[in-house]
C-alpha cells in the first residue's frame, strides 16, 4: 500500500473510503466477510453506523453490506 493511516472500520467516519489491508480473526470470520466481498485489497466506503455498537453499513463494489460491530471492529482499513 502507499503508507496511509490504518484504522479499524468502526473508527472510520461516515463517507470515508479506504482499502482493506487485514482481517483480524479466524478462518470463519475471514470466510464470512469474504463471502460478502470484504477481503484484503478491496476498496470500501463507510455508508453509516448505528449508535451503541450497532451494525455498520459499507459500500463494497456496487453493493451495500451491513455487518455487526464486532466484525467491523476486526477489519483494518488503510484510508485514502
Where do the PLM segments sit?
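Compact, glycine-rich, soluble single-domain proteins
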Residues: 1-80
Amino acid at each position: 500500500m502507499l503508507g496511509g493511516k490504518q484504522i479499524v472500520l468502526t473508527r472510520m467516519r461516515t463517507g470515508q473510503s479506504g482499502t482493506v489491508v487485514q482481517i483480524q480473526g479466524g478462518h470463519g470470520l475471514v470466510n464470512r466477510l469474504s463471502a460478502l466481498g470484504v477481503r484484503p485489497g478491496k476498496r470500501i466506503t463507510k455508508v453509516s453506523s448505528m449508535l451503541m455498537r450497532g451494525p455498520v453499513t459499507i459500500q463494497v463494489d456496487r453493493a451495500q453490506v451491513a455487518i455487526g460491530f464486532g466484525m467491523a471492529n476486526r477489519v483494518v482499513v488503510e484510508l485514502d
